[in-house]
């Protein structure tokens, strides 16, 4: 007997029971994005490897350890995208969307990172990202945060997420801070674990979000990034905080929040939750005003965020039991007797012509009346349409309300209008 082939570790199948809740959540997310004037963009899953090395930074965990990279048959190095911002910027430059233009874009789809699979973190995962190009004030940063806060309210999870903010300043300001931080770490190298020692010179800001308790204790005495910010970054951050205060959005300034990708500057933010066990990030982003130029375009201010959908779905299911998925089927069409199958098929098509959004399933599995009613219940149908030989001959149909058991016989020409009343 042949061995079963199974899904790759960390890359999951999502079955109909799963995709129903995904579709409802995604529908809410997309509706809010449309309400803020964002347009969808779709990029390839595979990009040239240098794109991510230049955008994310060669000395990052993503590039060093986590990317799925391979050579194609022409020897070109390609990578399954580990995130969406780099590809979005590449597409914007390539198609002339960015220079001297304002763009508000969103994308959704699978990303790939070779990580240890755990709850809410997988090797193939799904992100929804939003990116804004051509606007540099703190007001658009604030609007992105307001957009995400509207999502949380719509999903019923507002009480279970907290906003953390920081400013990491300009490139020059970070260079000065980096020098001061390295000097401090060198004086306490005995406290650092191997990972922090490796990062100390290659990417010292990443030491700030070490999970090692001893390192966290040490960092209480480390130089503060806020003391090294340039005046423009300070003003930008103060403006953002004031806008959020006026909008009634609570937040915490977390001076150790630096994000794991090298392209960020000024504003960085995360929405975090404690409702999935250990604290986890649900949504994160910030400014990346230098990335467009870094990837070959004209200097363009930019800001955006990305959200992991697996973790969001888990959070909604964990904290909002009232979040329900609509029934798969509204109406189940039952037929029994000689010549009724064709009549049922034709009736179903006529009803769909009048009610195109109706979810109507026709029974094609045979079986007696009782079995077909059981199938209707299994699919969650609210109404059954029943066709027997006598109904077909008389151009009629029995309409049965499966919630209260009441039924009536109608002319087939009237059934669509009746269904609209019953299900409206």
UniProtKB/Swiss-Prot annotation:
Concerning InterPro entries, the annotation shows:
aa-tRNA-synth_II, aa-tRNA-synth_II/BPL/LPL, Anticodon-bd, Anticodon-bd_dom_sf, His-tRNA-ligase, HisRS-like_core, HisRS/HisZ, HisRS_anticodon
For this UniProt entry, the molecular function terms from Gene Ontology, in alphabetical order, are:
ATP binding; histidine-tRNA ligase activity
Q: Whose protein is this, by species?
A: Yersinia enterocolitica serotype O:8 / biotype 1B (strain NCTC 13174 / 8081)
Q: Indicate what this protein is called per its UniProt record.
A: Histidine--tRNA ligase
Which UniProt keywords are given for this protein, alphabetically ordered? Aminoacyl-tRNA synthetase, ATP-binding, Cytoplasm, Ligase, Nucleotide-binding, Protein biosynthesis
Source taxon at top rank? Bacteria
CDD domains named among the record's database cross-references: HisRS-like_core (cd00773), HisRS_anticodon (cd00859)
Its Gene Ontology cellular component terms are: cytoplasm
Q: Where in the cell is it found?
A: Cytoplasm
Catalytic activity, per the record? tRNA(His) + L-histidine + ATP = L-histidyl-tRNA(His) + AMP + diphosphate + H(+)
The Enzyme Commission number assigned here is 6.1.1.21
Family per similarity comment: Belongs to the class-II aminoacyl-tRNA synthetase family.
This chain is encoded by the gene named hisS
Q: Which Pfam families match?
A: HGTP_anticodon, tRNA-synt_His
> Quaternary arrangement and interactors, per the entry?
Homodimer.
* Gene Ontology BP, a term: histidyl-tRNA aminoacylation
- Asked if Ligase is a keyword of the record, the answer is yes
